[in-house]
Design a protein with these regions (language model features):
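A structural-propensity feature for long, helix-poor, extended segments
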Residues: 147-176
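Short glycine-rich or small-residue beta-strand-to-loop segments that form or flank ligand, phosphate
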Residues: 77-79, 109-120, 156-160
């Protein structure tokens, strides 16, 4: 947010701030807090056009203020991700792998859970990842014992959604964890973002687990260490944004870039922005074409 739009946001219409808008990205919560929050450590590095940010929320007070859980959040951003070259793709994949590896226990099997509805493009990320995964749990029994230490047991499932199965995803995963006994669960899901420019350009990795659908106000039983009994690492990419956000971004561009607002009319602009965001568009969410 730039220029007048940033001032308008701070002045009133967007005062709900960190707890008043829905997002699955810890980075956006930090940004709305002014970039500095007591009890939160943030480090940022740049590599090959990719922005690598590591956020650690250490205090419960900070977690409550941001609406996040205490723990580690790794965010990778590449603004032209859908059109990046092969070299950048490899670098980004390596950074994602490194981030996941840094949060995983050193030993033990891993269960990968692809969340979402495979019939809805914006919600099919988790299921599509599982379809392309190399699972190895069943292979460990077929190879020589001396080689097993180099092959970690990985199993995967796409459990569907409550509306199709009638069963909470967390309930299905809890049963699987009891039987498979992994050392950790990796949950992959589509996320919701507050800023439209983050759609399909950002990857978030966290060791705090995930609450499916929370970004769009559809609260389900969470996949966390408390509910499953093992460490849960969540990996996600923002795939949806609120329609009101797109309207605000468009208005901000017109105001900031083309000077379509005369001085002295800021209060009227705030009212217009509020009407657009809260009245006409409400909780409608938007996703890119496939």
């Amino acid at each position: 947010m730039r220029g007048f739009f940033a001032r308008a946001f701070q002045a009133g219409w967007g005062k709900k701030s960190m707890r008043g808008f829905r997002t699955d990205l810890a980075m956006e919560c930090i940004d709305e807090g002014g970039g500095r929050v007591e009890g939160v450590r943030v480090s940022t590095h740049h590599m090959g056009g990719i922005t690598h940010t590591r956020i650690r929320i250490e205090k419960e007070r900070a977690a409550e203020l941001l609406g996040r859980h205490t723990g580690e959040y790794i965010t990778l951003e590449y603004r032209d991700l859908p059109r990046c070259d092969a070299h950048t793709q490899k670098l980004l994949a390596a950074l994602v792998a490194q981030g996941v590896r840094s949060l995983l226990p050193r030993e033990g099997e891993v269960l990968v859970v692809g969340l979402g509805n495979r019939n809805v493009t914006a919600d099919a990320l988790g299921t599509r990842v599982v379809e392309r995964m190399l699972v190895t749990r069943h292979l460990r029994q077929a190879i020589a014992r001396e080689l097993r230490g180099r092959l970690r047991g990985v199993s995967a499932i796409a459990p569907g959604v409550l509306g199709l199965t009638g069963i909470e995803t967390a309930e299905l995963c809890r049963g699987l964890v009891r039987h498979v006994r992994p050392s950790a669960v990796i949950a992959i899901d589509a996320l919701a973002a507050f800023e439209s420019e983050r759609i399909c350009t950002t990857v978030q990795i966290t060791d705090t687990g995930i609450e499916p659908g929370s970004g769009v106000g559809n609260h389900r039983l969470g996949l966390t260490e408390e509910t499953l009994g093992v460490k849960v690492i969540a990996v996600g990419v923002p795939m949806v944004v609120y329609a009101s956000t797109i309207a605000r971004d468009a208005m901000a561009h017109l105001i900031d870039e083309y000077g379509l607002l005369a001085r002295g009319h800021e209060e009227a602009a705030q009212q217009l922005l509020r009407q657009v965001s809260e009245g006409f568009l409400g909780d409608m969410v938007v996703t890119p074409r496939e």
